[in-house]
Amino acid sequence: MSTTSEAVQSKYSEAGVDIDKGNAFVEGIKDIVASTHKNGVIDNIGGFSAHIAIDVTKYPKPVIVNSTDGVGTKLAIAHMCNKHDTIGIDLVAMCVNDLIVGGATPLSFLDYFAVGKLDIEVATEVVKGIAEGCKQAGCSLVGGETAEMPGLYQGSDYDLAGFVTGIVDRDSIIDGSDVRSGNKIIGLASSGVHSNGYSLVRKICFDDNDYSVEDHIEELGSTLGEELLKPTRIYVQQVLNVIKNYPIHGMVHNTGGGFIDNIPRILPKGYKATLQAGSWDVPAIFTFLEEKGKVPREEMYRTFNMGVGLLVIVAEDKAEDILHHFEALGEKASIIGEIQKQTDENDERVTILPEG
């Protein structure tokens, strides 16, 4: 039997898939994965599925919430810098931030890692980042899939996808239905570009201007690679803390599409958002990209987060208290706009007033 098995493995290895290396990788990350587990996880790392016991007494009308996302071509920057220990944080952030804006608490996370040829060291660094992201979000990394696919991916090139499951009581879902005219919009600062718009970022920096990730950019105070690999901020714990204490009418994860495309996703029919430019700090990386790429400001607002990673819509009389609560939790926050009624159906859903 062993001789036959070895022969089969040899043929599979010749085809570019190393089962033994894959098994060694899974064995090597077990402690990393287990370090994220919280109460309720029934440990079975390497099994066929993951099991979580849920205390539904906390949720009279429990609703399971799911979200999935990736990190796009930010992966190319990780390869250029040969730095793979933070891209997993981005992966978790993109998923859990989408989940939290609906008021849900993240419970478990799964990842999908597809690669041409498995490099255990690189893959382990990626998983370390995913585990760190899960710890920041307070959810458990309960499993994943590592797929070695020669012919579809070249060499060490890899792609990532993440899947998060959360829970919320039906009566506590935040869906924008309570948004009204006069509500204030609080913006929570981003760490930089986060994980959207990197195809344009790479074109501006490396195709049109011939920069290297190793170039030190004075206005950024770092190398270009260091700036572009800053992990996406995870807002879960801060938001969960606030929604326990205050009513929140709506939230927006400011990702691809920026303010222009994302805010309308939470607005009831007949309402619009007006933002005031200058009411929040725009990180230097966006000015750099705008100038080097000659990108119109309107396109910047529709492509990047422009310094605001999450928007929180609240009643006017609660806005200052909620703002200060976020600040007490360590968030850099500011009131950046308000909700208004549309004057007619052709009225823009999002308007950004110029500074001054």
UniProtKB/Swiss-Prot annotation:
<dbReference type="Pfam" id="PF02769">
    <property type="entry name" value="AIRS_C"/>
</dbReference>
<keyword id="KW-0963">Cytoplasm</keyword>
<comment type="pathway">
    <text>Purine metabolism; IMP biosynthesis via de novo pathway; 5-amino-1-(5-phospho-D-ribosyl)imidazole from N(2)-formyl-N(1)-(5-phospho-D-ribosyl)glycinamide: step 2/2.</text>
</comment>
<dbReference type="GO" id="GO:0006189">
    <property type="term" value="P:'de novo' IMP biosynthetic process"/>
</dbReference>
<dbReference type="InterPro" id="IPR010918">
    <property type="entry name" value="PurM-like_C_dom"/>
</dbReference>
<dbReference type="GO" id="GO:0046084">
    <property type="term" value="P:adenine biosynthetic process"/>
</dbReference>
<protein>
    <recommendedName>
        <fullName>Phosphoribosylformylglycinamidine cyclo-ligase</fullName>
        <ecNumber>6.3.3.1</ecNumber>
    </recommendedName>
</protein>
<dbReference type="GO" id="GO:0005524">
    <property type="term" value="F:ATP binding"/>
</dbReference>
<dbReference type="Pfam" id="PF00586">
    <property type="entry name" value="AIRS"/>
</dbReference>
<dbReference type="GO" id="GO:0004637">
    <property type="term" value="F:phosphoribosylamine-glycine ligase activity"/>
</dbReference>
<keyword id="KW-0658">Purine biosynthesis</keyword>
<dbReference type="InterPro" id="IPR036921">
    <property type="entry name" value="PurM-like_N_sf"/>
</dbReference>
<dbReference type="InterPro" id="IPR004733">
    <property type="entry name" value="PurM_cligase"/>
</dbReference>
<keyword id="KW-0067">ATP-binding</keyword>
<keyword id="KW-0436">Ligase</keyword>
<dbReference type="GO" id="GO:0004641">
    <property type="term" value="F:phosphoribosylformylglycinamidine cyclo-ligase activity"/>
</dbReference>
<dbReference type="GO" id="GO:0005829">
    <property type="term" value="C:cytosol"/>
</dbReference>
<dbReference type="InterPro" id="IPR036676">
    <property type="entry name" value="PurM-like_C_sf"/>
</dbReference>
<comment type="similarity">
    <text>Belongs to the AIR synthase family.</text>
</comment>
<dbReference type="InterPro" id="IPR016188">
    <property type="entry name" value="PurM-like_N"/>
</dbReference>
<keyword id="KW-0547">Nucleotide-binding</keyword>
